[in-house]
């Protein structure tokens, strides 16, 4: 029983090490984590960010509208 438990612990530790290694290689997600949204009076489609008070930086957002508790952010 102790050998089986030790083997499971070794396998679990190895899995954690390899998972952490893969996460370090991926510098950032290649896509936005936002859903499409529409605000009245604004043309086009915005990005709906869930449970955020402001639009995140780095995406070029210039305007927004609130859809409580979310925010719809519009680029340019």
From Swiss-Prot:
<keyword id="KW-0528">Neurotoxin</keyword>
<dbReference type="GO" id="GO:0005576">
    <property type="term" value="C:extracellular region"/>
</dbReference>
<keyword id="KW-1015">Disulfide bond</keyword>
<dbReference type="Pfam" id="PF07936">
    <property type="entry name" value="Defensin_4"/>
</dbReference>
<keyword id="KW-0964">Secreted</keyword>
<keyword id="KW-0732">Signal</keyword>
<comment type="function">
    <text>Is member of a fraction that shows antiangiogenic activity, since it inhibits human microvascular endothelial cells (HMEC) tubulogenesis. This protein could be a kunitz-type inhibitor with a RGD motif that could block angiogenesis in binding on integrins. Blocks Kv3 voltage-gated potassium channels. Reduces blood pressure.</text>
</comment>
<dbReference type="GO" id="GO:0090729">
    <property type="term" value="F:toxin activity"/>
</dbReference>
<dbReference type="InterPro" id="IPR023355">
    <property type="entry name" value="Myo_ane_neurotoxin_sf"/>
</dbReference>
<dbReference type="GO" id="GO:0008217">
    <property type="term" value="P:regulation of blood pressure"/>
</dbReference>
<dbReference type="InterPro" id="IPR012414">
    <property type="entry name" value="BDS_K_chnl_tox"/>
</dbReference>
<feature type="short sequence motif" description="Cell attachment site">
    <location>
        <begin position="45"/>
        <end position="47"/>
    </location>
</feature>
<feature type="disulfide bond">
    <location>
        <begin position="39"/>
        <end position="65"/>
    </location>
</feature>
<dbReference type="GO" id="GO:0008200">
    <property type="term" value="F:ion channel inhibitor activity"/>
</dbReference>
<feature type="disulfide bond">
    <location>
        <begin position="55"/>
        <end position="73"/>
    </location>
</feature>
<keyword id="KW-0872">Ion channel impairing toxin</keyword>
<keyword id="KW-0382">Hypotensive agent</keyword>
<feature type="propeptide">
    <location>
        <begin position="20"/>
        <end position="31"/>
    </location>
</feature>
<keyword id="KW-0800">Toxin</keyword>
<dbReference type="GO" id="GO:0015459">
    <property type="term" value="F:potassium channel regulator activity"/>
</dbReference>
<protein>
    <recommendedName>
        <fullName>Kappa-actitoxin-Avd4e</fullName>
    </recommendedName>
</protein>
<keyword id="KW-0632">Potassium channel impairing toxin</keyword>
<dbReference type="GO" id="GO:0042151">
    <property type="term" value="C:nematocyst"/>
</dbReference>
<feature type="signal peptide">
    <location>
        <begin position="1"/>
        <end position="19"/>
    </location>
</feature>
<keyword id="KW-1220">Voltage-gated potassium channel impairing toxin</keyword>
<keyword id="KW-0165">Cleavage on pair of basic residues</keyword>
<feature type="disulfide bond">
    <location>
        <begin position="37"/>
        <end position="72"/>
    </location>
</feature>
<keyword id="KW-0166">Nematocyst</keyword>
<comment type="similarity">
    <text>Belongs to the sea anemone type 3 (BDS) potassium channel toxin family.</text>
</comment>
């Amino acid at each position: 029983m102790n050998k089986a438990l030790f083997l499971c612990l070794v396998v679990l530790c190895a899995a954690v090490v390899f998972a952490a290694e893969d996460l370090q290689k991926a510098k950032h997600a290649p896509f936005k984590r936002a859903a499409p949204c529409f605000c009245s009076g604004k043309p086009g489609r915005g990005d709906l960010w869930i449970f955020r008070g402001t639009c995140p930086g780095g995406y070029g957002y210039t305007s927004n509208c609130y859809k409580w508790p979310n925010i719809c952010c519009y680029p340019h």
